[in-house]
């Protein structure tokens, strides 16, 4: 591990990484609320729109495999900022795309650079923050999801309605410039992982990671968590409108309430995990998440206040699992291979995300009245994956001194 940072510099590092992660998460999240606008603008089907979402995840998975061959060969800060700059250019290309296919290609590039970048953010936390504070530090960076939910979705819709669908992407590109400048000034160089011994084969770092059975267990655990969430998440909005009867105008309230709640609870869960033990806290939060996983997929009608309460509990607990889980996963890596491992983890998560969304799409259907059918079956799949993850986490060994 790199030498400990002074408290002030550690805070600068975490807030800067949180800003970079915010840009990345916001770029991914705005696609779903922009769906109706893009479908009308390009005259495409819902399936074609689904490709715009899926290409991001699968490109991130492919870039993760490629990134695993070189990520531990470079100093962390420079590689992160380089990927961040390319991500910003790809996002700007999304905003300037003249048609559907050019937007599809631009989304693929954004996913490719974003996939490596997201892994590097967690890698730098693992390299710079001691084990005893790692979950709390991770919760601060994970708060980017909550801020994106609270501010990103409403702002993206407001900009799109005020100008057009291109405005949110241009807005994110401006954010990238701001956070890239901050990163250049505030992020420390991290090169402790660099080995004096040169590895001949470009896939040597990946092979070294995959030789460790503990790494395989951590990757399987990561896939289970993502799979259990993303069988449900992509279809919550559609189910809310068509089955529960929530107005399209009230959908931002779901994200606002859920994001605000997770913004508060994320830090509390991170502190709790550092104090009581990451595995114990993960199991408790994941077990509690079984309730909203069941309710969200089985409730057939509800007033707005009750549905918002259910979805808020879903956001808090399902995303809350990720805070101790990411600390466990990061600590499972051999320190000298952490960059490669976290890149492979990002690939694993992206594949799990794409496969979960695809499987759920095969299970559910829409009847003649427009209602979503068999969403409850998707819930059972998610609950099963969550239960397996609760059992499986105990098999992962953490490197507590690094």
Regions found by a protein language model. Name each.
Residues 31-32, 215-255:
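Extracytoplasmic gate region of multi-pass secondary transporters
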Residues 62-101:
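Conserved MFS/SLC helix-loop-helix module at the cytosolic interface between two early adjacent transmembrane helices
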Residues 64-75, 266-277, 364:
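Helix-to-loop junctions at the C-terminal end of transmembrane segments
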